[in-house]
Amino acid sequence: MSLPAKKAIEIDENITHYIYKMLSHESILKYDETKCVECGFCHRVCPVTISIYDEPLKRTAIGTPKEMRIESDKKIVVDTEKCIWCGSCTWICPGYTLELLINGENKILLVENGSLAEFDEEVRTLENGHKVRKVVHGSIKFNCNEKDTKVIDKFTEECAVDAMSREGNDIAVDIDKCILCFKCSEASKNYDNISVDIHRDQFMKVKGNPSSVWNGIMLRVLGKEGKIKGIMSRSQNKLADSVMRLLGKESIEEE
């Protein structure tokens, strides 16, 4: 095997290891399908943005198969050619779905060197026994003009953390359970008479003074729409370059 080497290994039907092996160390991004709540946070915080035909950058190194344009029946897939194993997705993941191992040790270098902040979190256990954490403060509002209660019930079931319920012809949310993710707002696009307005105002109490990389990544999470922001050049990616430097790597490998 020539080094460095990148590959994906399916351990079983639910567990996938995304491996980056070099002479001095091995990084493994572990993904557990059973824990994924399809929140969309990993796709937003990934610092790697890929230019597609010189259009605004919307694709990162991790996301749903549709977002990644990769054929798969998994909820989330990783582009091993673009992933830099920085751990940003692990750092934000509310469902503990992703885990980064460096030489067998669970660690995120960007947190250890102070580039990404540690923050308070609210953790609870779902009915299926899996844990989920809330990492951002904000608000959520539904605009429901749907008359068919069966359609409303179907929409409330889109929530993977049991935070939504139907009250008559309206949608109620338990804000203590809601993790203010992107799942229901994305799902609402498939419902003609339901829309969602989410504001992610700030992270839980932040510890320390993180670097400018923090500011760049926060642009991808906070705000009304949580749009991915990047530059529009096929050859440059300033945020990813900054992350690579903080990880002690010179540049992103090109295909």
Where are these regions (language model features)?
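Acidic, low-complexity mobile loops and tails
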Residues: C36-E38, V151
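Short, contiguous, helix-prone interaction/anchoring segments in small proteins
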Residues: G40, R44-V45, T49-P56
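Histidine- and aromatic-rich ligand-binding microenvironments
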Residues: S27-I28, E38-F41
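Flanking helices and flexible, charged tails adjoining ferredoxin-like Fe-S electron-transfer domains
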Residues: M1-S27, D54, R59-K75, T80-E255
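Local sequence-structure signature of Cys/Sec-based thiol-disulfide redox active-site neighborhoods
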Residues: Y31-K35
